[in-house]
Amino acid sequence: MTSDQKLIIPSQTYRVDEENKTIWVFLEYRQATLAGVSLELLGKARSLADASDSSVVGLLIGRGLEALAKEAFSYGADEIVEIDDPRLADFNVEAYADAAAQAILEAKPSIFLIGATHDGRDLAGRLAVRLQTGLNADCIDLLLDSKRGLLISEVTGFG
């Protein structure tokens, strides 16, 4: 992808819309099948959403996404945001970060989950910087503190 083809957005501070109770999941896929980590995250998002009167939204970026969207619905997504563009047919972290950041800034989800894969870690770090927001990495469990409106992340510790 050349620089004139990129979707460029300025760095903006991300602020959650307090009324928007949505939990988004970045849906990774390989060869027209959702990745296992995405299915796990959809399941976790579904349990968090059910406990907090929220909805689950899957974010699909790429090309030819219809079958993947149907699969995501069967694993607990209430809605799918598809960014279907021929320039996004193959994973390119800069292009995917541009597309995801635009969607996040527009929709303002309360939580955004990304799998701890090679591509997911790269994308998550870039989004955190672009959106000037926090990043909880390598979580083994997620809980909601509904009284304080906090997402609590459990991580393993050594030492």
Where are these regions (language model features)?
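N-terminal glycine-rich FAD/FM-binding segment characteristic of electron-transfer flavoproteins
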Residues: M1-G159
